[in-house]
Regions:
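Alpha-helical substrate-recognition element adjacent to the catalytic core
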Residues: 2-119
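Glycine-rich phosphate-binding loop signature in dinucleotide/nucleotide-binding domains
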Residues: 21, 132-139
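Surface-exposed amphipathic alpha-helices with a cationic face
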Residues: 75-79, 133, 155
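Short, surface-exposed basic-aromatic patches at helix termini and helix-loop junctions that form
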Residues: 99-107, 134, 154-164
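Structural recognition of alpha->loop->beta junctions
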Residues: 104-116, 177-186, 190
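Donor nucleotide-activated moiety binding/catalytic core segment of transferases
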Residues: 119-135
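Acidic, Mg2+-coordinating phosphoryl-transfer loop and its flanking beta/alpha structural elements
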Residues: 138-186
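Non-Sec secretion/translocation targeting segments of pathogen effectors
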Residues: 199, 206-209
Length: 209
């Protein structure tokens, strides 16, 4: 084998490797997984989720106060590596939601969202995943969510499931962020340091240039 043949073989291998990586799907929930939107959470007097109250707070005035969670480090790393990264969310996505994603460099290859469906979270995500994965060449890989019932749905499609709260907590500890009020039954939502998020974002943006 001469040098030119070796170079061509290396290019072919790299192309094949890139294509294999791109076929692998990594899915992220948004709320309480990548984004802390707890200040907009609404409940009825009985403690059940108030969807109408949530919708009323889905304006830019409120959404701009949302905060990125530590799992964004992983999001940017997966994007940089070339995986297909999607959002699977129970939100009814509107312009303020998309604006927040754009302004925080959360660029998904696809966003599977509620639309006008009134289904429960896990039922909605089951249908959206079924439709998305029915297209040839898509391989389920990782699925991040804060709810066990959604993780169970993802397992049916072959995803390795990741509990968002635990990964956010691990990232906090790994990056030496302050950890407070943790016990076996109460894992709080933690926010990463701005400078750490900035470093991850810069690495991702540099690759795009």
């Amino acid at each position: 084998m001469n040098l030119n043949q070796a170079v061509q073989m290396r290019k072919a291998f790299k192309k094949e490797h890139t294509e294999v990586i791109k076929r692998q799907v990594i899915a992220f929930d948004l709320d309480h997984t990548l984004i802390d939107s707890s200040h907009r959470h609404c409940t009825h007097p009985d403690g059940s989720f108030n969807l109408q109250g949530w919708i009323e707070k889905s304006t830019w005035e409120h959404i701009q106060k949302d905060v990125l969670l530590p799992l964004c480090h992983h999001f940017w790393a997966f994007k940089e590596a070339g995986f297909t990264v999607i959002a699977v969310t129970a939100r009814e996505m509107r312009e303020p939601d998309y604006r927040f994603l754009r302004e925080n460099d959360l660029e998904f290859d696809a966003i599977l969202e509620r639309g006008n469906s009134k289904e429960l979270d896990e039922q909605l995500k089951n249908g959206k995943l079924r439709e998305f994965l029915s297209q040839e060449g898509r391989i389920p890989y990782l699925f991040f969510d804060d709810k066990d019932e959604n993780l169970e749905v993802a397992k049916k499609y072959g995803f390795q499931t990741m509990k968002a709260q635990l990964f956010n907590l691990k990232t906090v500890v790994k990056d030496y962020h302050s950890v407070r009020n943790i016990n076996e039954n109460n894992i709080e939502t933690f926010s990463p340091k701005e400078e750490d998020l900035a470093k991850s974002k810069i690495n991702y943006l540099n690759r795009k240039i």
